[in-house]
């Protein structure tokens, strides 16, 4: 699975915070254009079409990543920031970051030494109003390279753990992007299947707008949305988490089409693909919520890759879970989808 691993690392290390997905969209286009016709819509979503049968199945994954946005340049070259997506302020102290200015500028989130912290400081994380980034530049130097509105991402080298697990930044949802690219490759040579459309959507982390606009334009009979979800770890509620190396999580929720969820389960069992269930009592917090009500409604299912350390600079997934997620989706498509 080295080629899959390398693709995930390639995707995860690229820029592409919400609303500034240009770099990641180019990388995705490069991968997908090898087997499908690729376009970019007005919103910046990357779409692709693989024609075959009358029925059309849409595969969706969001390509944006969480980060920060520059709001002010202070004296001494320090940057004030706001979060861009669900960045967790608790894990930012002393992190090294990249500011995507006129050229990449490296910086470090400031941190108060414990010797100078008050007891109250130790009890809480800084909020974004008090977070500063040290660039090492003077204000005048910083203003030549950095503008208000430039995006910032946490730097994280990718790597491997034991038992086929990998870590890196932005695996939410670059892992999902890898899943649908891999699934599309697995079915590309078959013509005895439904037509397939791919949607690599922007701005999921700031509200899901890319899925709204993208699914409206891409007419489809049904959709499988792919994202990450919680994987178990110490002190995590086990009933709300999947497990690493135990297969994709098949979503069951009111907004999801129950027949698709059942067909995914049946497909996994028939093809001996390990899977887990993810039960949600209302919405899913993913693009599936928006796609399901697009236009007159699209029957939508959800497949998730279990992930630890979500919304941090170092997220952990199982490479095996990514491969099995792609296999499940490919077998679902080759089986004709719903009501085949």
Which sequence ranges carry the predicted segments?
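N-terminal hydrophobic/helix-forming segments and targeting peptides
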Residues: 1-340
């Amino acid at each position: 699975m080295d080629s899959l691993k390398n693709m995930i690392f390639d995707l995860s290390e690229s820029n592409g915070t919400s609303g500034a997905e240009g770099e990641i969209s180019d990388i995705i286009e490069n991968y997908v254009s090898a087997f499908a016709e690729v376009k970019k819509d007005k919103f910046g979503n990357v779409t692709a079409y693989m024609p075959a049968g009358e029925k059309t199945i849409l595969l969706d994954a969001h390509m944006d990543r969480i980060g920060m946005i520059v709001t002010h340049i202070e004296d001494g070259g320090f940057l004030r920031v706001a979060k861009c997506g669900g960045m967790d302020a608790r894990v930012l102290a002393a992190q090294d970051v990249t500011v995507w200015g006129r050229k990449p500028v490296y910086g470090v989130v400031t941190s108060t030494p414990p010797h100078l912290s008050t007891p109250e400081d130790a009890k809480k994380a800084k909020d974004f109003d008090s977070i500063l980034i040290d660039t090492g530049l003077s204000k005048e130097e910083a203003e030549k390279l950095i503008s208000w509105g430039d995006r910032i991402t946490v730097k994280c080298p990718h790597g491997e753990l034991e038992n086929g697990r990998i870590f890196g930044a932005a695996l939410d949802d670059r892992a999902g992007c890898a899943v649908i690219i891999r699934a599309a490759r697995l079915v590309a040579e078959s013509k005895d299947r439904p037509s397939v459309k791919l949607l690599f959507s922007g701005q999921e982390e700031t509200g899901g707008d890319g899925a709204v606009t993208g699914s409206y334009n891409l007419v489809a009979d049904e959709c499988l949305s792919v994202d990450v979800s919680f994987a178990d770890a110490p002190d995590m509620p086990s009933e709300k988490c999947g497990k690493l190396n135990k297969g994709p999580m098949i979503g069951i929720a009111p907004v999801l089409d129950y027949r698709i969820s059942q067909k995914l389960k049946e497909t996994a069992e028939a093809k001996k693909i390990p899977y887990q269930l993810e039960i949600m009592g209302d919405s899913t917090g993913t693009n599936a919520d928006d796609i399901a009500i697009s236009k007159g409604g699209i029957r939508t299912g959800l497949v998730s890759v279990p992930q630890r350390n979500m919304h941090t600079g170092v997220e952990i997934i199982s490479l095996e879970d990514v491969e099995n997620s792609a296999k499940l989706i490919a077998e679902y498509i080759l089986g004709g989808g719903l009501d085949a």
